[in-house]
Amino acid sequence: MIFDIRVSVLFHLYLRRLRAHTVQELLAGSGIAVGVALVLGVLLANTSLLGSTEQTVNGVIGSAKLELVARSNDGFDERLVDRVRALPGVQAAAPVLQESATIIGPKGRVSVRLIGVTPTLVTLGGALTQNVSAGPSLIGEGVGLPTGVAHAVGVRPEHMVRLLTDGQARIVKVRAVVGAESIGSVAESPLAVALLGYTQRLTGRPGRVTQVFVEPQPGADQRVAHELRELAAGRLDVAPADNELRLLRKIAEPNDQATTMFALIGAMVGFLLTFNAMLLTVPERRRYIADLRMQGYDWRQALLITGFEALVLGALASIVGIAMGYVLSHTLFHRVPVYLAFAFPVGDQQVIMVSLILLAFACGVLATLLASLVPISDLRPSRARDAVLRQAGGAGDGIDRRTTTVFAIAGLLLVMLASAMVLIDPSLTLIGGAALALATLCLIPVAFKGAALVLRGANEHIHSSALVLAVRELRTTSMPLVALAGVGALAIYGSVAIGGARHDLLAGLDTNFREYLSTADVWVTTGGNDLTTNSFQAPGLQTKLAKAPGVSSVRVYQGELMDVGTRRMWVIARPSSDGTIIPASQLLRGQLVRGDQLLRGSGWAAVSTSFAAEHNLRVGEPFELPTPSGSRSFAVAAITTNVGWPPGALILSTADYRRYWQTSAPSALEVNLEPGVNPAAGKLTVESVLGGYPALTAQTRQEREARYAANSREALQSLGEISTLLLIAAALAVASALSATIWQRRALLASLKIQGYDRYQLWRALLLESMIVLGFGCTIGAVLGVYGHVLASRWLTLTTGFSAPFSLGIPRVLLDVGLVAGIGLIVIALPGFLAARVSSRVALQE
């Protein structure tokens, strides 16, 4: 027993209440479920990539602790592996050749990481290599594919696929398809495995490997690392075997920070939506508490009963909300982060942690319990037990003037607090966003009071019974109306702040890539989402293209991804004949013309702001850069943004790249057309020359811009998902809240009928009142959402190192407001009309 009440009695009381107020409890529960679904949905949208990638990396490296890795895609001499194995502290060493590739099958094409392995890698115990490369199915020539890749291209074992790599197209046989029962979630990763010798032939790199995984003898890790560094002689890197994960953490950090901030804002909005859904029941619960007190229950027992009922309702509704959030995350909002597949072994599987489900459940239950405690003031000893029942109208749900004033002051203070926190420390933007969301709720009561005054004045000139009724309801500032407006305000706030910041970031990225690609009319590349970092061999192609009709010039562009410390940086090597080298919109420090001039020479590089900050670099200062030919000295020609790649970029000349990277292989050919030649016609001319190079693709500048724009939007998919989830949740929550509000007011509508109002007057009053409530709520949410957008855009610029110029985006804001308000009016139209038909006898029954 608890406070002299058996648990069975608590269940009995709740069942009795549920029978008496079934519709109200269902509507409140649906609102809670929507809030929980939003919380879980945004948390799942923010699921880190590291969970799936860690399983993939561990499936390859097994028990290896160290790796000797090349600084370029060309790798290093395979004979070095024997010297590694001969080191005193080495227990096992396995060479690997990794190369970006594309597999084409009957159903489509997939970009993969082609991994060439030897049987010695099996001794390291990696799940992937044990189950793919160790079996007899790969003895000979062929590749092994995870089921995710095989299903995507539509092949099975012994089928033939087309493999594109190094600018060449080859037909290879699929020797094995391995599923999750053998390699777990790695089965969804974009990989292809073959024997090392065969991979070397496929990639045109005979006798080359890109890394050696090393398992030291017990206790010999540091000694072996030292020996490997001596063996590397400044031309190779020595790193932990799971260095891929460390690099991925660095690249994912800005995006994770941004999506985490917005996910938490979205989750908080979901929490408050849940809270507001419960607030809709406050008037009836206050009457229920008064009835309990009149029946002889003391304050502790009344509190226990209401708390228990809230706990049951919150738990059941949260379970439904979790199911809704799970379905949303696996249908409309399942992330496919293939934009990183060319740089990391990232799969499209979504890792769902039990902790996220428990967190969403806890949020739903906690919000329900907190909202159920709102009537607790009625339990104080100085207040009469039946005070609520004796209030005018019997509702006891109005917010008085003093409380309204306190809320208004609190709202203004929260806005000022958010501003001060963000100015003092940008890392406090998350707390500032939460403060603005709370301010949104606090300012609604005073907005209602102001609206009532304005509309009361308007009513003197506009004689409308509907307006009279609407103004009377607004003046009471009832809890259900405040909660209803709060639903719309919170959703609009979150959607405007998150969607606006995402739009700014995308606009900055689009401008960057447009300038980056402006140096050529037609680009010849290997295709794919690779930031133009895949080199290829195409002997004689440049000369053939230069002789083609309508072609003005052909230039070699080079570039790759290179590991520099904890960063996998984007190396951009521009020919001196390019029109512009530094994207103008991305320049932060230095002079554009001067920087371009320096980069056309030798020994200069433009560095991104993240790299410059990490190494305390300023324009003109020297720095050392590890290259495949050893450490080389460069000077800073300019400092740019991160130019669309989170770890940062280095821009230098192709002359320096050829010299220090020791390769002349292009990553792209930049083709400029004669004046007056249509880009589409020029592309057809280029494609006719590419007939002998089936693995290469020609794209006009506009087509390549569209590809990069699509990649940017995929990279920021989580922010779009969260913004969309907020609007969907708002629509569902508004529908639930409006239905609950109408249901609760049946007695009031019946009493108005007794006073002479007909159904059509009541219906118009409901529509007008709903329009005003949602309009003011959404307006407050939009205003503070725009301010949150300003703060978020500034924070994104500082966090990601990308350009994110602020844009108000009024049409986008109006669209969000119109969507939520429009849904509300559509939802209330039919139920409102049905409610307006209520019999006047209901007033006497209540």
Please report, for each region that a protein language model flagged, where it lies by residue.
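Hydrophobic, regular-secondary-structure patches
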Residues: E25-R113, P136-S137, H151, H159, ...
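Peri-transmembrane interface segments
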Residues: S52-T53, E230-M268, T281-P283, L292, ...
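Short beta-strand boundary microenvironments
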Residues: V112-A152, T511, L531, P539-V619, ...
